[in-house]
UniProtKB/Swiss-Prot annotation:
Molecular-function GO terms, alphabetical: oxoglutarate dehydrogenase (succinyl-transferring) activity; thiamine pyrophosphate binding
Protein name listed in UniProt: 2-oxoglutarate dehydrogenase E1 component
Gene: sucA
Pfam families: 2-oxogl_dehyd_N, E1_dh, OxoGdeHyase_C, Transket_pyr
Species assigned in the record: Brucella suis biovar 1 (strain 1330)
Keyword Kinase applies: no
Gene3D superfamilies from the UniProt entry: 3.40.50.12470, 3.40.50.970, Multifunctional 2-oxoglutarate metabolism enzyme, C-terminal domain, TPP helical domain
Length: 1004
């Protein structure tokens, strides 16, 4: 009796002492409290006693239980019979659900009390409370079990101090309760289970060699799928004997390859996989399981660590080719030009077959700039998905179709946590114009970043935490348990192929040697490297496990190692005389294209379009469906455009662009235009996507030109430069027949993607034999808008120009813009195009063209003559060539400033010559033009400061040209703004004063 009297107090003490009332259970307790305030007899006596002691205001209690006023009515999703509410801690719902089920079972005689009789009401309440406590404990394991998993192969990681949150005592269970069967409604795949049975499944599932983070996912279907896949008495990590031997074989190959290179090329950098060999069988599993689920192609991106191993053991690159490169040989045939790159940056492609499923693998070439290859891989994958489906209209490609191409990214732990482009790519993952049906991220977490410990390289517990923002499931796994790693890879692949979402594998391993093979890691990590030196390799540990299981003998393992070594020796010998027989860069989608020849030739391509075709396209550009409500201002815009097409006069910049896009689409070239606000255009000039003013439906005239045309996509991108530009570059690598454009909101912001310009666009062809026809539209022009809205920093791109690597242009007429865009697709080679695009010229009365200039025999002009030379109705008539006293050369918008100032002053002996394409520099064409004015003074005029713009780049070229024509003045004089630290002034008065000064200098 005394014991009974003591029970409520003891329960209260337990409640008070434990974290049973921690935040996750608060809602449940508040709802119970509200029930108690309505009717004290409706709750369990122990709870009644507990609440009686609190003495809170009844109205407050009820308000708290109702939750905040802004709570969504339909959230959380109701229980579906499998206790989904337990995922979200909706305990009141759980208790009601369990009680109802138990009552039903008692009524049918399925649930019996201790005496074997049907359950009484009191026993049902007790059983329901047991169930709720058990489910709370299960939820704690799902939420926090990963923190207790055995993840670190070295055993150096500190255990979390979590106040025993996973202990059964925390949930009101004592050892006396351990033998009692508790109703858990199939939550762990069991209807009834004792506490030890639950713990056995929970510890194995959540605290073994795999730690799963998935409770941050809000989609119940995704969460339920993961639980269903890994929880239950029959869900152990299990492999057949053949599967285990296959894993051992791959580990021996991975380890043996690294050891072989270490012996043959002592001290040479290879960035070995030593310590992370489980990666290799895991990648095989991803390809194999993906292939079974419909995967056709994998696009890989990875850093240097383990790259050679992936190339040889996963991609199937011949070992002799790698050994040939190690001894300093080229990776391309002798007749292919290129500056080359180090071994651990090179790409490759191959086909692998598993179980009759053929999967194409391609590894993307990348620079040492960590993680910047990620968006490139995603862009490549997106283009391959589009090609696979054969898109012709702006229809959504189903994600199940996109899922046939998998972007697979391998990361280092420090880089994944540290590089901003990682978060940008995760941000792109769900966007309509950039999604790829989920990227699989594999972190090789060797728990160190060069010499920096994780505590100094990230603020979060795991390197993978950034992926939580997109609710990606995360599988942490111990790299010394190859079976667990392969299992995690399998489940991750299945999740991606099922839900078409990104997924992360975080493999804890170690780096057996230094950052590179010439490095001494003990300087900075003495304790870690002491542990590593004493630690057995993954092959040794797994070999011992299989020997203990009786699957193999030590002799078997020794023989496997010897056979592999013998194979490598044979390949090593073959590598001495190996000759690459062919560069693979013009295969597949690139078949029919070639490398470009002499940079100074015209290389115009046939870019003109018949007037009839242009008028047909123009007619469609201004048509909208009958029931479509266009904005009044847009209707005026369309009416003006219709007038231009009718008269063939006054073609403005945006119309020329739409005609270029439309004519290419009709000829079968898809157009992909991406960037911030590109649908409308930063300056409200483009309007290629129209919105119905009453229902916001979209209409895209460029996708309604004719049957069978190619697609036009305008993608308002996320507010990122680096990832989006990298993505579009990647897209251009996979589809040379698509015109891919990226437009900066203002050219000034393009330097947020400087790495992509430096490492890929300007140098990718020379380093890796990879051509790209990407177009970058960078709004540029000094109009008094201040230092961040004036300059795309033209000088930066010109400084990168050499060896015919890309084109840089600053065109001044809509016709030239039309031709340069079409030229990108109308030649049999591809080069990136960096284009300074106008702002004020978009609506300038002089910056117009005629349809005649887009048709007939017209083409792109690298140099443009003075308008006064040909237009008879201009304000001034120029003197004959011999009487011209000065030639002012310029590029871009400043031409119109000079032209109008000259007209205002009535000057007729100064000739204005525009350089429309700055690189490749049109030297021969300029010799022809300037030969007309041998005796004239030569001036270069620009609106940019002297240390910016084209001056430093063009000065030596102009000097060379003047020497060739034997000009009277052998040096060009500079006219423009003086050198400055900031590109432009923010004061309009100062801007106008500077403009007046350099116009006086150029024309005075």
């Amino acid at each position: 009796m005394a014991k009974q009297e003591q029970a409520p107090d003891r329960a209260n003490d337990v409640f008070a002492l434990t974290s049973f009332l921690y935040g996750g259970n608060a809602d449940y307790i508040e709802e119970l409290y509200a029930k108690y305030e309505d009717d004290p007899n409706s709750v369990d006596p122990q709870w009644r006693d507990f609440f009686a002691k609190l003495g809170d205001n009844a109205d407050d209690v009820k308000k708290n239980a109702e939750g905040p006023s802004w709570t969504r009515k339909n959230w959380p999703i109701a229980a579906n019979g499998e206790l989904v509410s337990a995922l979200d801690g909706n305990w009141a719902e759980v208790e009601k659900h369990v009680t109802d089920k138990l009552k039903g079972k008692a009524a049918k005689g399925e649930a019996k009390g201790a005496a074997g009789t049907p359950l009484t009401a009191e026993e049902i309440t007790q059983a329901a409370r047991d169930s709720v406590r058990a489910i709370m404990m299960i939820r704690a394991y799902r939420m926090r079990g990963h923190l207790h998993a055995n993840l670190d192969p070295l055993g150096l990681a500190e255990k979390p101090n979590d106040y025993n949150e996973l202990e059964p005592e925390n949930y009101g269970f004592t050892p006396a309760d351990y033998n009692r069967k508790i109703f858990i409604d199939n939550v762990l795949g069991l209807e009834y289970a004792t506490v030890p049975e639950m713990l056995d499944i929970l510890k194995r599932t959540y605290c073994g060699a795999i730690g799963v983070e998935f409770m941050h996912i809000s989609d119940p279907a995704e969460k339920a799928w993961i639980q269903e896949r890994i929880e239950g008495p029959d869900k152990k990590v299990a492999f057949t004997p053949e599967g285990k031997k296959a894993i051992l074989s791959k580990l021996i190959e991975a380890e043996g390859f690294e050891q072989f290179i270490d012996v043959k090329y002592k001290g040479t950098k290879r960035f070995g996989l030593d310590g992370g060999e489980s990666l290799i069988p895991a990648l095989e599993q991803i390809v194999k399981r993906g292939g079974q689920m419909g995967l056709k192609e994998v696009v890989l991106g990875m850093a240097h660590r383990g790259r050679l191993n992936v190339l040889s053991q996963v991609m199937g690159k011949p070992h002799r080719a790698i050994f040939h490169e190690f001894k300093g040989g080229s990776y391309t045939p002798d007749d292919v030009e290129g500056s080359g790159d180090v071994k651990y940056h090179l790409g490759a492609s191959s086909d692998r077959e598993f179980d009759g499923n053929k999967v194409h693998l391609s590894l993307t070439a990348n620079p040492s700039h960590l993680e910047i290859v990620n968006p490139v891989v995603m862009g490549k994958a997106r283009a391959k998905q589009d090609l696979l489906v054969g898109r012709t209209r702006d229809d959504m490609v189903p994600l199940s179709e996109r899922a046939k191409v998998l972007p697979l990214l391998l990361h280092g732990d420090a880089a994944f946590a540290g590089q901003g482009v990682v978060a940008e790519c995760l941000g792109l993952s769900g966007l309509k114009g950039h999604r790829v049906a989920g990227t699989l991220h594999f972190i090789i977490n060797n728990q160190i970043g060069f010499t920096t410990n994780p505590a100094f390289s990230r603020s979060s517990p795991y390197p993978s935490d950034v992926a939580k923002m997109i609710e990606a499931p995360i599988f942490h796994v111990n790299g010394d348990d190859p079976e667990a790693v392969v299992f995690a890879a399998k489940v991750a692949t299945e999740f991606r192929m099922t839900f078409h979402k990104p997924v992360v594998i975080d493999m804890f391993c170690y780096r057996r040697f230094g950052h590179n093979e010439g490095d001494e890691p003990s300087f900075t990590q003495p304790l870690m490297y002491k542990a590593i030196r004493a630690h057995k390799t993954t092959v040794q540990l797994y070999g011992e496990k299989l020997i203990a299981e009786g699957l193999v003998t030590q002799d078997d393992i020794d023989r496997m190692k010897a056979d592999w070594r013998q194979k490598l020796e044979g390949e090593f010998e073959a590598g001495q005389s190996y000759k690459p027989n062919k560069a693979d860069w013009l295969d597949g989608a690139w078949a029919g294209l070639r490398t470009a020849d002499n940079a100074d030739e015209q290389r115009r391509g046939k870019t003109a379009v018949p007037v009839k075709t242009l008028k047909e396209i123009g007619k469609k550009l201004v048509e909208v469906p009958k029931d479509f409500h266009v904005h009044r201002t847009i209707q005026r815009f369309l009416d003006n455009r219709a007038k231009m097409m009718e008269t063939g006069e006054g073609i403005d910049w945006a119309t020329a662009e739409s005609l270029a896009f439309g004519s290419l689409a009709v000829e079968g070239h898809p157009i992909r235009l991406s960037g911030q606000d590109v649908e409308r255009g930063t300056f409200s000039q483009r309007h290629t996507v129209l919105y119905d003013q009453e229902n916001q439906n979209r209409y895209i005239p460029l996708n309604n030109l004719q049957k069978g045309q190619a697609i036009y996509e305008a993608i308002n991108s996320m507010l990122s430069e680096e990832a989006v530009l990298g993505y579009e570059y990647g897209y251009s690598l996979s589809d040379p027949r698509a015109l891919v454009l990226w437009e900066a909101q203002f050219g000034d912001f393009a330097n947020g993607a400087q790495v992509v310009f430096d490492q890929f666009i300007s140098s990718g062809e020379r380093k890796w034999l990879r051509m790209s026809g990407l177009v970058c539209l960078l709004p540029h022009g000094f109009e008094g808008q201040g230092p961040e809205h004036s300059s795309a920093r033209l000088e930066r791109y010109l400084q990168l120009c050499a060896e015919d690597n890309m084109q840089v242009a600053n065109v001044t007429t809509p016709a030239n813009y039309f031709h340069i865009l079409r030229r990108q697709m109308k030649r049999d080679f591809r080069k990136p195009l960096i284009m300074m695009t106008p702002k004020s010229l978009l609506r300038h009365k002089r910056a117009i063209s005629t349809l005649a200039e887009l048709s007939g025999e017209s083409s792109f002009h690298r140099l443009l003559w003075d308008d006064a030379q040909y237009n008879k109705d201009e304000g001034i008539k120029l003197q004959k060539d011999a009487k011209i006293r000065r030639v002012v050369l310029c590029s871009g918008k400043v031409y119109y400033d000079l032209y109008e100032e000259r007209e205002k002053r009535g000057i007729d002996d100064v000739y204005l010559l525009r350089v429309e394409q700055l690189y490749p520099f049109p030297a021969k064409a300029l010799i022809n033009e300037l030969s007309r004015f041998r005796h004239a003074e030569m001036v270069w005029c620009q609106e940019e400061p002297k240390n910016m713009g084209a001056w430093s780049f063009i000065d030596p070229y102009l000097e060379w040209v003047l020497a060739h024509i034997d000009a009277k003045h052998q040096r060009v004089r500079y006219a423009g703004r003086p050198a400055a630290a900031s590109p432009a002034t923010g004061l309009m008065s100062k801007h106008l004063a500077q403009l007046a000064a350099f116009l006086e200098d150029a024309l005075g």
